[in-house]
Amino acid sequence: MLSMNETKRNVRPAGFEDAEDIFSLIKAYPEELLPRPISDIVQNIDRFLVCAQAGRLVGTVSWKILPEIGAPRNPSIEIQSLAVDRAYHEKGVGRELVGAVIARIRATHPAQIIALTFCKPFFERLGFHEVPKEELMHKIYAGCINCSKYDSPFTCPEIAMILDIAG
């Protein structure tokens, strides 16, 4: 029988049939991820990718377009809700998901890709670098204002990281 490392993985766009599994993956990380109601997942299913292995979903990632006021040709895109089943950590699932979402995003020519994360080394290995949150506040404000975990984006311990891809 094949092990988790030997079983073929499939990263693909999410479908409506994946919504409940996506919800469960995100819900498994209450300290690390903002909750996403299942209705939000369904409404944004076209902005989710999933990783399936051994007949089940083992990871998910989504993205959000952050338009720049007065510069519609230079939006940033935020990677959100990256969640990998704990049994599949350190097996390349997160790297595959982020790589797939970057490839998809790159085709739209955004100015940069943003991630707010507790996993700085993971994103550094993918080419991201840390920036002060103040540099991104106008872009992430809409998400941060609805956060139920922290009083202010400046008290949130997440690290702001960007991948510059314009050029």
Segments predicted by a language model, with ranges:
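Conserved active-site alpha-helix within GNAT-family acetyltransferase domains
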Residues: 117-143
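Conserved GNAT acetyl-CoA-binding A-motif
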Residues: 105-118
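A short beta-loop-alpha structural element at the N-terminal edge
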Residues: 8-22
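A conserved beta-strand-loop-helix scaffold within acyl/acetyltransferase catalytic domains
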Residues: 36-47, 53, 60-76, 80-82
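Hydrophobic adenine-recognition pocket in adenosine-nucleotide-binding enzymes
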Residues: 14, 82-84
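Helix-loop element at the rim of GNAT/NAT acetyltransferase active sites that forms part
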Residues: 25-36
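Conserved acetyl-CoA-binding loop-helix of GNAT-fold acetyltransferases
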Residues: 84, 90-103, 115
